[in-house]
Amino acid sequence: MAPRKGKEKKEEQVISLGPQVAEGENVFGVCHIFASFNDTFVHVTDLSGKETICRVTGGMKVKADRDESSPYAAMLAAQDVAQRCKELGITALHIKLRATGGNRTKTPGPGAQSALRALARSGMKIGRIEDVTPIPSDSTRRKGGRRGRRL
C-alpha cells in the first residue's frame, strides 16, 4: 500500500525576519511620533522612511473619541509598537517628533512625551531625538477672520 498523503513529514524552514547582525549590535528604525491635540500616531519605518514596519494610533487603543490624544492612549500605542519592533529584530529607534505645525499650533500634543517615555521603558534603545514640526517661513493666512476667534 502507498503511504497516506496526510502523514508525510514536512521540513520545517526557519524564517528570519530581520537583518543578520552580530550579537550586541543595534538594529535601528525610525519612529515618527505625530502628536496633535486630537490623536497621537506612533509610526515606525526603516531608516530610509519608505518602508512601514508598524503604525499604531491612540484611537486604535481606546474606545472614547475624547481619549484618542490622551497620554494613556499614546502609552498603549507605543508599547504595541515596541513589542512589534522587537519581534522583527529592531532594537533601537531614532525619534522624529512632530506637532501639527503649518499655520496651526507648533506645540506637540499631550501624547508626545508619554509615547516617548513608553518606548524607552519598554526596552528600546533611543538614538537621536529630532523635532520635525513643519514651520513655515511665511505662512498662509490663519483661519478665524480679521477680528480673530471670539470666545
Swiss-Prot record:
Single GO term (MF): mRNA 5'-UTR binding
Pfam families recorded: Ribosomal_S11 (PF00411)
Subcellular location: Cytoplasm; Nucleus, Nucleolus
Listed Basic residues bias regions: 142-151
GO cellular component terms listed in the entry, alphabetical order: cytoplasm; cytosol; cytosolic ribosome; cytosolic small ribosomal subunit; extracellular exosome; focal adhesion; membrane; nucleolus
Region listing for Disordered, in residue ranges: 131-151
Superkingdom, taxonomy of origin: Eukaryota
Cross-link (Glycyl lysine isopeptide (Lys-Gly) (interchain with G-Cter in SUMO2)): 61, 63, 106
Entry's Gene Ontology BP terms: cytoplasmic translation; erythrocyte differentiation; maturation of SSU-rRNA; negative regulation of transcription by RNA polymerase II; ribosomal small subunit assembly; ribosomal small subunit biogenesis; translation
Phosphothreonine PTM sites in chain numbering: 133
Modified residues (Phosphoserine): 16, 139
NCBIfam families linked: PRK09607.1
Subunit record text: Component of the small ribosomal subunit. Part of the small subunit (SSU) processome, composed of more than 70 proteins and the RNA chaperone small nucleolar RNA (snoRNA) U3.
HAMAP family referenced in this protein's UniProt entry, alphabetically: Ribosomal_uS11 (MF_01310)
PANTHER family in UniProt: 40S RIBOSOMAL PROTEIN S14/30S RIBOSOMAL PROTEIN S11
Function: Component of the small ribosomal subunit. The ribosome is a large ribonucleoprotein complex responsible for the synthesis of proteins in the cell. Part of the small subunit (SSU) processome, first precursor of the small eukaryotic ribosomal subunit. During the assembly of the SSU processome in the nucleolus, many ribosome biogenesis factors, an RNA chaperone and ribosomal proteins associate with the nascent pre-rRNA and work in concert to generate RNA folding, modifications, rearrangements and cleavage as well as targeted degradation of pre-ribosomal RNA by the RNA exosome.
Name of protein: Small ribosomal subunit protein uS11
Organism: Homo sapiens
Gene: RPS14
